[in-house]
């Protein structure tokens, strides 16, 4: 299984970097012989071909049905799997270096986004803590020479003690060009006061006036149901106090809301009680920061 995952992610990184340079080569690149999962729920394509021309994927299909352009660079990827880039729907980029905070800068953003790309993650939604440098990189990423993951940003996590304050904070992030509005509504396990519901309602209203989706950090099932009925667009964490019930499932389906369970984040709260298996995985260790280990 480890070899399969390694092969899959390695070819994702190869596709990302090669597609960014093909325009400079003024030609096409054909990845030949892979299993291809196209993300549409269709059956995998065996012995497939992906053709990239001028930095864009032009053709995907079985070898028998794809004509490789004359003069194309051909890369044999037999035994590997190609799939669409992975999306990190809830991340935070650029703020840490090793175990230290306070390192939000362009170089650190580029370092982390490059690491994402090398492991097959091609898009990151950064939901909070984003500063001007992150917005600038977001604005520069629509270029086929890109050699990192794309980033979409929320700006600062929105807080306010009144409806007037919360609307002003939404407007501040919107004026910066945020892609989302991020808010925490829980009590941080009893250490803080929950956001009053009238203030959350005002936040949602103002965000939607500014045509921005609302991503809500939460913990409790009753809050999850409330924000769904109030108009939240992304549930940014798992419900963690109770098992979800039929009412919650029906609400998610009826509202068409994105549910981001952040399961790996939850695993991180207990997996280090003993040494996890991936600490001996060469693929993980290749780019793991020594300060974290």
Predicted regions and their residues:
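Active-site neighborhoods of metal-dependent hydrolases
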Residues: 168-191, 239-293
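Alpha-helix-loop-beta-strand connector modules within alpha/beta enzyme cores
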Residues: 142-154, 195-216, 252, 256-261
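Bacterial Sec-dependent signal peptides at the C-terminal "C-region" and cleavage site
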Residues: 16-28
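Active-site gating/metal-coordination segments in enzymes
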Residues: 156-205, 226-229, 234, 289
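Histidine-rich, glycine-flanked metal-binding segment
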Residues: 27, 36, 42-83
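Metal-associated gating/positioning segment near the N- to mid-region
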Residues: 80-145, 161, 222-234
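Divalent metal-dependent hydrolysis catalytic cores, especially in the metallo-beta-lactamase
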Residues: 109-132, 148-156, 176-188, 213, ...
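Bacterial N-terminal signal peptides
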Residues: 7-18
């Amino acid at each position: 299984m480890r070899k399969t995952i390694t092969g899959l992610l390695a070819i994702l990184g190869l596709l990302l970097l090669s597609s960014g340079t093909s325009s400079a080569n003024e030609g096409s690149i054909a990845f030949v012989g892979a299993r291809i999962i196209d993300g549409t729920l269709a059956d995998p394509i065996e012995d497939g071909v992906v053709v990239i021309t001028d930095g864009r994927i032009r053709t995907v299909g079985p070898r028998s049905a794809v004509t490789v352009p004359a003069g194309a660079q051909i890369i044999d990827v037999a035994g590997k799997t190609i799939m669409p880039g992975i999306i990190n729907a809830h991340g935070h980029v650029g703020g840490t270096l090793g175990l230290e905070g306070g390192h939000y800068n362009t170089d650190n953003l580029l370092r982390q986004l490059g690491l994402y790309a090398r492991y097959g993650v091609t898009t990151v939604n950064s939901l909070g803590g984003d500063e001007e440098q992150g917005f600038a990189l977001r604005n520069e990423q629509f270029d086929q020479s890109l050699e990192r993951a794309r980033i979409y940003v929320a700006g600062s996590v929105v807080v306010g003690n009144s409806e007037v304050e919360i609307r002003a904070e939404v407007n501040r992030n919107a004026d910066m060009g945020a892609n989302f509005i991020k808010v925490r509504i829980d009590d941080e396990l009893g250490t803080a006061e929950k956001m009053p519901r009238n203030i959350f309602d005002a936040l949602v209203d103002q965000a939607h006036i500014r045509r921005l989706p609302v991503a809500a950090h939460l913990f409790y099932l009753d809050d999850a149901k409330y924000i769904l009925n109030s108009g939240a667009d992304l549930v940014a964490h798992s419900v963690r106090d109770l098992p979800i019930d039929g009412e919650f499932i029906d609400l998610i389906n009826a509202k068409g809301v994105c549910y981001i369970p952040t399961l790996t984040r939850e695993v991180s709260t207990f997996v280090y009680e003993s040494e996890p298996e991936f600490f001996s995985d060469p693929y993980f260790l290749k780019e793991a920061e020594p300060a974290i280990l």
